């Protein structure tokens, strides 16, 4: 059966989205092991995650200029394999300082990968007039599930973090040459020059970025503190704790796989409002339940609720008049990922002084803010993606 060019491009882009999810899933699921391996306390873990965040913010800030100069295709080709080489450095760490330096390398490369892969996804939507941003973000979640599950497997086998990271990422890189031929040229390459757009960033794009910051902050709290919450506050085993991000990402995959169809059926406002409410409910269950199994269910509900939210922001921003898809992607990525990179370390300082369970009370508040922000997406206009459904 002949495979269409769109399917090949979407599959190649999905591969690059899986990579950061895989890295992040393994890193977060093995956080208890990395903590014991380096002897770091909660305050030091918070500082280490801050190093991760600052490095990511530097690359996110530079990504718009770098991508404009060298194209998202070139940047992604270079930084995707570098990210896979950076994570095993964390497995070699034997002190908090070494772990912090490894996190700088991971955060710096991940920032470039995040912006360039989102730009590629928007380029595919624009080239074929078919939706794929939600599908791409589902691929990231699939990577997170795989990373979490392999992390739990290696933890159950009492394998080192270095062996865990190296074996899984070596297998991932075997498919790298197959994805390269199907990457997309940026719009400036297709038109032979720079696109004429306003130098000002539209307010709606900034709104999408701000709300993405809130959503990613909530996601980041699950990824970097969820396993530790179960391990330290709920008396769960390391194996059970490692399943937190996997449970979260599994339901997020389901939600994002049907995200485009849900947008077409209900519109952005009802989808964002319902998703925020479900995330609020899920995190509340996590905080009040004394049972680890019920906490996993709460995180699963939270993943399902947050699933369609960020893809809507990227899609709407990328189709906003007066700005290129690449620049819109960079703006939303920079603002959004600042949440996942900076907010969790701040939770570390709160946890050190107030306790982790108390610090995580902030998360339901963030979900409520997302529900309030959905008010700005009230419109009777059908998403453009609905005109060409999968």
For the regions a language model picked out, list residue spans one by one.
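Short amphipathic helix-loop junctions that connect adjacent transmembrane helices
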Residues: 29-43, 224-240
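Symmetry-related core transmembrane helices of the 12-TM Major Facilitator Superfamily/SLC fold
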Residues: 162-180, 360-376
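Structural signature of the two symmetry-related core transmembrane helices
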Residues: 74-88, 270-285, 364
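Cytoplasmic helix-loop-helix junction between adjacent transmembrane helices
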Residues: 103-138
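Conserved MFS/SLC helix-loop-helix module at the cytosolic interface between two early adjacent transmembrane helices
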Residues: 58-94
